[in-house]
């Protein structure tokens, strides 16, 4: 109750099968192996600036369908050495709370519901981010180490620089350190492609941080909906892959769009405008 903190720590697995709740304090759940979270095992802070810090230091995190992590104004961080199968993350306050999901292997979404409701969302995977991940956020950044990034956003969104911090509790259940993650824009490695779309009729996209696909990775950015715009304020580049930029209304290009040998396809239902700082280059492609 109140602002009391909660620390759950195990030298093996942790199975969350009942609600873990703090009125306004911080929660740390730290397992040396795996963490599983059932639909009855919601984890939540109910007020103030309390954060949620959950980590499987030697294994995976498995959130079953219906499992929820929520912080009423604070931030959330889930980290695993291996895969993270995601459920629902909700910071309730879109202006303050951010979510960070960091997987040593893959970030996996097994349903078609919106997975993350927050101000900012940071995704980082040693493997892929896929299925796709459905979001309802204001700002987003993501990085894949060896595969594709697939994200569908439910509203207007900025691809941005994100820094997410949570409080790590020590053995006395007091804050012992601040854990922070940082990502800038959308980045795929090892020939991974990037697919970032808003749902039909739902949102504009503002590219306020670089979008970069390694080697032959392709890039698709698509803003869907009447009056929805794709605005390119930072560079969109791939090594030798293809770039497709689509908008149901306008595309505004204030930056470089570049590939070395691939093709660039830019289509807008209303208009495409390039400012003086806009440049499109294929370096031998189409």
Please name every model-derived segment:
Residues 1-286:
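Extracellular lectin-like interaction modules
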